[in-house]
Amino acid sequence: MQCVWTLSLLQLVALWANAAVLTENGLPILWDQAPSQLSDLPQADDVVTINPWNSLQRMSLYRILVGSTDKYMASMGTNDSASPLWGLPLQLAWKVRSGRLVDPTGATTCGQEGDPMCISTNSWWACVNYYLSVIPFLAAVQKGLIGDGLIQVQVQAPAEAAEDSCTSYTDCSAKYPDLMAKWEEFFQTLKDVSASEISDFEKRDQILGAFWAGETLSLNTASSSCKAKMSYYSSPEVAFAKSWMNAADYVAAAYFQSSLNNSVLFMGPLPSRVLQEGDSAPNIADLSTEENHTLYIFGWMNRMNTILLGSPVKMWRSAMCSDKAREKGRELLQNLILDPKFAVSTFVSILTEMTRSCTGLST
């Protein structure tokens, strides 16, 4: 078993060359330029105003969030890069670097060379990310993890994005009560669990469970709210977007620890550009072997889930019935997504056996 793990690590290290484009000096791109304190953002009369349609300001939400919650993450690992929240700025970094925040309609230059910090309100990817940035940030402020409780936070909402946006904690809670409550629950869990006497293993499992519950509901909310924006993209990009959402269900159920290093490894082989008509993995000439493989596997996972009416995802969730099962699930996903030599049939047979084991435990 140890030999297999060592080989797997060596294979993963080989992906760093591709993944490096998401980072600068080991941190997400734009991280060093993004404001690191609430007081660094524009404010007047004790009201901080955030423009989440600017890449630097949206990245600042994550920088402030990661910094403010780090003291509660000791159970995650021995350094400050182990927090699962690192996965969120890495997602944003990939979307920026791959051109997925650019106006897909071509009607404006938003996100292009002349206006690189602009996040287009027409971008499906930007819309989805909104629910993974603004909502968690406002929830953290409300729960007292960010700020001193005296400064209010306002969020800019462009007229063309008014329906998909909200301007404050009160406004966002009214529009998305269940989602805001789920993220508040995560931050409360973070505070409570970090102060408890349970083992670090148990703390980690509870924190990751609450984190992925928040991220899953954010994605589900975004799926319906952002759906119309998919019409701006090619059919291969739409198919990839749907498969990306489907893959998130597997990652969430396994309680993936989206630390800085883990997130870079898993996001490095995501496609480095928006897909166009005619792109068909695993034979897209200007994408790397790893990118082609990831696109192919994501597509296969989504096709199987569609053909079998959602039963593969349900089966996967059933198989993630214990902390040990989730640990095995994380390793299985790692092999499937990152190792081109790992057979799909092997994945299916192992998953089937894991499901049987869980069924046996529950009877």
UniProtKB/Swiss-Prot annotation:
InterPro entries (alphabetical): Leg1
Function statement: May be involved in early liver development.
GO cellular component: extracellular space
Primary gene name: leg1
Main location (coarse class): secreted
Organism: Oncorhynchus mykiss (Rainbow trout)
Keywords: Developmental protein, Glycoprotein, Secreted, Signal
PANTHER family reported in the protein's UniProt record: LEG1, PROTEIN LEG1 HOMOLOG
Record-stated family: Belongs to the LEG1 family.
Keyword tRNA-binding: no
One Pfam family, short name: Leg1
The keyword Secreted is annotated on this UniProt entry: yes
Name listed for the protein in its UniProt record: Protein LEG1 homolog
Leader peptide range in chain numbering: 1-19
Cellular location(s): Secreted
Glycosylation sites: N79, N261, N292
